[in-house]
Amino acid sequence: EKAARRLGDLGHSNLAILDGGAPAWQAAGFTLYQGVNVPSKVFGELVEQQFETPSLAAEDLKAMQEQGESVVVLDGRSPKEFRKMAIPGGRFCPNAELGYRLPMLVPDENTPVVINCAGRTRSLIGAQTLLSLGFRNKILALRNGTQGWRLAGFELVHGATPTVLPEPDEAQLAASRMQANALLVKTQLQTVDGETLQTWLSDDRRTTYLCDVRTAEEYERGHFTEALHAPGGQLVQATDEWVAVRNARIVLTDDTQLRAATTAMWLRAMGHQVWVLDEDASQAPKTSANAASDSSTLLPALEPHKLSIR
């Protein structure tokens, strides 16, 4: 009722309140979804069904490692999650970075690559991203991620420090741009120029999100003033944490367009309207004007005892 009143104050008129709320919905035989980032997690399952993304069990990976087989294990999660728990021998490489940095992380095309997360979604999305980009290595998702590893009776590494990601040289950057262009053409993803983007951002009738999908370090070195920092892998995994307005425009930016394109590919498949900015974010000036990724600079602090009396 409070939300309905607030929406009415904002000028909305076609409003209704669900009689009985969620309990009544469930009592009527409809489904209630539980958990976090549910749309993204459901999407991961659909991707596996659609593409038949290959995977392997924890026992199989463990056997490969014990037999001394050459295999690269890449953890597609955030730095914080990697520190909390990781597969022994695994290397930190967030999902959006996989296609961008894989040539620097594997010795040759004959080396199998296993992508893991804590459960399923990012393992599947990360592996399928590499497959969709056409890498010739054997690409596999680790079934059930670190959870599956632990349930199989194997120990995890806790407190691991994420390895610094390798930086591409000029030749690798050029190759990345070519790969991005090929993906844009193949998937018919839309691009947008800076002038049009500014028009969209000034439009008070429709929300536009500009998301910088690079690493935090790159973002801090320089970014477009209006850009939110939203690492591409996490933006796909937890879209609802960045995009609050339905049918909003989503514009993604990076340096070579590869990370933006792979992220856009999945966001569009999820039903979002998404564009890739055709400008190089690495050439943007360092600015303190945009602190959108740090809400503490935008909102006043509120002590717990003050919150409790409101």
Per-range role (PLM):
Residues 1-72, 76-209, 213-310:
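Rhodanese-like catalytic fold shared by cysteine-dependent sulfurtransferases
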